[in-house]
């Protein structure tokens, strides 16, 4: 290789290095300008129907819908870890749900709150019981005046068909390892001791519910208890009681979320993290204490 050829290669290498440096510099400036303009998006997570534990499942027999705790948790995790998701808008249209599934989702919402990303709640037609448990975890809650919400309380039900079994001449018998192994059996009456045990469970979960609302809404626990008798409230009534922050629809909540996340409210982009697969709620789920 001649000296002239070497000089050409050195010059070419210098040009390439300079171009790379300029590219890195311009990229950094572009990113800085992007952050300065507040670019990014609002992550939107939807909770529709009753909240249940486990994964989304397909069932040709099921015409009902609901929200899987595992799916909602996955979406919330992605929104929390996504650096471009500057705020999270959770649209809730749910009448109730299982306690464990609701608490799982609530824990993911706590992690988002700890990351300092704002969570804005938009209530749909109904955001009651388990739906309100989750709503109370948000930084700010929007509802429509006629939204059905509240229903702060816990219940556990069971059916006893002992008399019916006697009428049709069918007898149920079982072998069990302990006196209470078949508690909630529909084939025998509940004992007084069992009723006390179950009432204790319901009372414990009720206290957890009340404490969650009191903490989330910065309310005195006794004040929450005074309205935590299962009553249904309109959105306007809930606002008067301190359970809702403002009247507004989905887009009002979206604008507030964008503003809270430092985004341009005139050019809001949204992103959802839902699976593309169409799933239906399984009919066959175990018994659970419900909110």
Model-derived features with residue positions:
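Short gly/pro/ser/thr-enriched loop/turn and capping motifs at secondary-structure boundaries
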Residues: 126-129, 148-152
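N-terminal organellar transit peptides
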Residues: 1-127, 140-143, 157-291
């Amino acid at each position: 290789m001649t000296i002239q050829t070497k000089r050409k290669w050195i010059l070419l290498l210098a040009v390439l290095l300079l171009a790379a440096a300029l590219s890195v510099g311009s990229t950094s400036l572009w990113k800085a300008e992007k952050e300065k303009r507040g670019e990014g998006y609002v992550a939107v997570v939807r909770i529709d129907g009753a909240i249940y534990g486990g994964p989304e499942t397909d069932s040709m027999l099921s015409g009902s819908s609901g929200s899987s705790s595992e799916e909602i948790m996955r979406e919330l995790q992605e929104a929390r870890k996504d650096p471009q998701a500057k705020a999270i808008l959770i649209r809730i249209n749910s009448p109730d749900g299982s306690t464990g599934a609701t608490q799982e989702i609530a824990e993911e919402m706590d992690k988002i709150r700890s990351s300092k990303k704002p969570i804005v709640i938009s209530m749909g037609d109904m955001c009651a019981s388990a739906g309100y448990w989750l709503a109370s975890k948000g930084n700010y809650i929007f509802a429509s005046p006629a939204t059905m919400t509240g229903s702060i309380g816990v219940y556990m039900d069971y059916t006893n068909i002992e008399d019916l079994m006697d009428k049709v001449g069918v007898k149920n018998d079982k072998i069990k390892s302990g006196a209470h192994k078949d508690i909630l059996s529909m084939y025998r009456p509940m004992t007084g001791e069992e009723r006390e045990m179950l009432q204790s469970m319901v009372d414990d979960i009720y206290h957890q519910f009340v404490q969650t609302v009191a903490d989330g809404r910065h309310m005195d626990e006794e004040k929450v208890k005074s309205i935590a008798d299962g009553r249904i409230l309109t959105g306007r009534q809930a606002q008067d009681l301190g359970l809702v922050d403002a009247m507004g629809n989905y887009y009002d909540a979206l604008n507030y979320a964008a503003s809270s996340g430092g985004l341009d409210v005139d050019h809001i982009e949204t992103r959802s993290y839902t699976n593309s697969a169409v799933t239906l709620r399984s009919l066959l789920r175990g018994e659970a204490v419900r909110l």
